[in-house]
Amino acid sequence: SYNIKEMKLIEMDDINRPRVDVWGVSDLDLFKEADNILKNKKDSSKPSFMIIQTAGNHRPYTIPDDNDGFITKSIKKESLTKAGFKSIEQFNAMRLLDHSIGKFFDLAEESSYYENTIFVLFGDHGTADPRAEHMGLEDYELKLRSYNVPLIIFSPKIIQNPQIINRASGLSDLMPTIAGLCKIPYINKTIGRDLLISDNNLAFLVNKKMNPTSYGVID
């Protein structure tokens, strides 16, 4: 927050909810706190930007007792491996994250901020397992899967024509894409581009998993 004077960091000690493990509060409680902050903004007409960073799908994969009805599942080790999971704990932690996101949107749909908000869901990195059926061996050997992350942009009123974009892209494209959706005038000095402008298909990527680090442009 040093470079952005109006940025406010909300840390674990600022949230009146219990710590569940080394990562702090549960993702579910984190989403509930975010919803509470958004609902109680002093000036609802002033635009705002919020980042919610989840951590529950990391070891030790804690399932909190207070989980709004989440039920763990037990499946065979063979099925876990084929799907790319390394343990039943990791599988259920991913399911809990999905459950928590769903609960957040349930809360958001009941709020005044819902229809005027652009929700952007993305991962910071992926993972690879050569035994997973949906992952090619090249994903594992070239570490490509580490850079294959989900990106979902959702807004009930602002995005009128939903679409699936199949062009190569990277996390550096998020800032100009979000600015474009918000119709904010800007000079793009980043290495990313607006994904909704189809005349630029080049994506800048960095592969730090290789030695030495490799840089490239993908069309």
Locations of the language-model features?
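Solvent-exposed soluble domains appended to multi-pass membrane proteins
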Residues: 1-219
